[in-house]
Swiss-Prot record:
Pathway: Purine metabolism; IMP biosynthesis via de novo pathway; 5-amino-1-(5-phospho-D-ribosyl)imidazole from N(2)-formyl-N(1)-(5-phospho-D-ribosyl)glycinamide: step 2/2
SUPFAM superfamilies, A to Z: PurM C-terminal domain-like, PurM N-terminal domain-like
Gene that encodes the chain: purM
Record keywords: ATP-binding, Cytoplasm, Ligase, Nucleotide-binding, Purine biosynthesis
Listed name of the protein: Phosphoribosylformylglycinamidine cyclo-ligase
GO molecular function: ATP binding; phosphoribosylamine-glycine ligase activity; phosphoribosylformylglycinamidine cyclo-ligase activity
Organism: Streptococcus gordonii (strain Challis / ATCC 35105 / BCRC 15272 / CH1 / DL1 / V288)
One GO cellular component term noted in the UniProt record for this chain: cytosol
């Protein structure tokens, strides 16, 4: 083993790493926004906070991945939307606290650096950043032979946003009588996929199940997570929202109570929840108890807002999309979430 080839013979292709950087530059350029300083490739990404115009800035950060949805992206060899999932999981969390996303960083670890595939992944990250209004200011691609199989990779992201101190959403303003408004999800989003994969383990993905309205199973399973930033930011700026819950792992039961105090509860009318076909299919083919579905999945509502009754009309006007009045905030007696 010569010194020149030593690293390559251990499974790390440095030249492929350089190629990835060149391939992703055009995608990163799409995410440029006011405040970005420096260029791709520095030791640290820089952002000038003064460019936001926020008077009393509070930085709010979030980090997440996409779980085993990645395994389906690998199985179906479709890698161009999984990056959007990663961005969505992070920015939807920080928008729930009232933050406007400013910038994003990604981390990809793989067993074998395949530049064309990794370009697709980062292109998806960039698309997510564009939808969120966040700049992609840095990242890391780690080739780790022996840690991962050659076809395997993992993806994580980190979002940083800013909120006006007076506009932080921390649940303290949520009150009895507030109306719960649901914003539609695009599908399963990015949680519950260990169960999803078990339910559909014997399917190729090419199937068109009767519940899925003409779509192939793999298309529905890989539908990218909706990013709610541009829909919800105007509501935050006008201080129309008292609480926001991002419905991810743990479904309604775990996530809705995170947006209000311990002495309150959410009373939800199940008949008003816009349940998507994929959830009906999962319940049927997976033989999952109906009540458990609400403990795992978003069931068609990816983001839930708590809004004072007098502000509901203005919120609907600004959203300009179907908005579902699915319940109210009540005084807590026993459970934090009551589904009727």
């Amino acid at each position: 083993m010569t010194n020149k080839n030593a690293y390559a013979q251990s499974g790390v292709d440095v030249e492929a790493g350089y190629e990835v950087v060149e391939r992703i530059k055009k995608h990163v350029a799409r995410t440029e926004r006011a405040g970005v300083m420096g260029a791709l490739g520095g030791f640290g990404g820089m952002f000038d906070l003064s460019k936001t115009g926020v008077k009393e800035p509070v930085l709010i950060s979030g980090t997440d991945g996409v779980g085993t949805k990645l395994m389906l992206a690998i199985k179906y060899d479709k890698h161009d939307t999984i990056g959007q999932d990663c961005v969505a999981m992070c920015v939807n969390d920080i928008i729930a606290a009232g933050a406007e996303p400013l910038y994003f960083l990604d981390y990809v670890a793989t067993g074998k650096n395949e530049p064309a595939k990794l370009e697709q992944v980062v292109a998806g990250v960039a698309e997510g950043c564009v939808q969120a209004g966040a700049a992609l200011i840095g990242g890391e691609t780690a080739e780790m032979p022996g840690m991962y199989g050659e076809d395997d990779y993992d993806l994580a992201g980190f979002a940083v946003g800013v909120a006006e101190k007076s506009q932080i959403i921390d649940g303290s303003k949520v009150a009895e009588g507030d109306v719960l408004l649901g914003l539609a999800s695009s599908g399963i989003h990015s949680n519950g996929y260990s169960l999803v994969r078990r339910v559909f383990a014997d399917y190729t993905g090419e199937e068109v199940l009767p519940e899925l309205e003409g779509k192939k199973l793999k298309e529905v399973l890989l539908e990218p997570t909706r990013i709610y930033v541009k829909a919800v930011l105007p509501l935050i700026k006008e201080e129309l929202v008292n609480g926001i819950a991002h419905i991810t792992g743990g479904g309604f039961i775990e996530n809705v109570p995170r947006m209000f105090a311990d002495d309150l509860a959410a009373e939800i009318e199940e008949s008003k929840v816009p349940v998507l076909p994929i959830f009906k299919a999962l319940e049927k083919y997976g033989e999952i108890k109906h009540e458990e579905m609400f403990e795992i999945f978003n069931m068609g509502v990816g983001l839930m807002l708590a809004v004072s009754p007098e502000n509901v009309g203005r919120v609907k006007e600004l959203l300009d999309e179907p908005v579902y009045e699915i319940g109210r905030i009540v005084k807590k007696e026993n459970e934090s979430v009551i589904i009727k």
